[in-house]
């Protein structure tokens, strides 16, 4: 923290930073099965997932890809679908034995523990006028979002959502809505959730900085308020959560994300 003054002008700053990680040293899961939530040596909140190659731009590209990288789930893979990477070179994309030692083509792609949590307060005052602003945030955090609120089109009409962000889905040349080959989301489909497996390409960067509060006030001179029988009067305007900087999709609030993954 810091505080100083120059004549009638005073100012100050306060910064708080914290960080923590947790590792499980011993857990009754000798096989280190990933079907069980925890295992010895696990860094808490690790996110296991597949590696995203990209969105197939043509049927030919998808056919060539799945010839050597065929997912063990889903069918009718086509242009606009996700291409997953076969990391172990066996020609199939799967979770192997689903253990730490044999996770197939999954790896630890992130961690949802909030890291480098911080708060910054700045304030100043001059001849009865005061100003303060408070920022808070998280310096590093990965987060996996799932379900229709993130993906939009999902397992069926009644399991889907339609926010403006979801319009950025892949569309081919000649589509009535216009082509969108550089889309964020894969093609819209009610055909299951084969494009929505936990994967690197859609892992969210949940780090953020938010202006939690900003306030401007004025304390009336004592000679004014004493005539009304009062000792002090301060008038002020205040605003909360007026600015947030984050890479996470705008559908979600990085400060109020649910429980940690893993």
List the predicted regions and their residue ranges.
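Conserved small-residue
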Residues: 2-111, 152, 168-176
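Outer-envelope beta-barrel architecture signal
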Residues: 7-13, 116-118, 127-129, 207, ...
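Membrane-embedded beta-strand positions of outer-membrane beta-barrel proteins
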Residues: 13-15, 133, 235-237
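Extracytoplasmic gating/loop element in the C-terminal half of outer-membrane beta-barrel translocons
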Residues: 138-234, 238-240
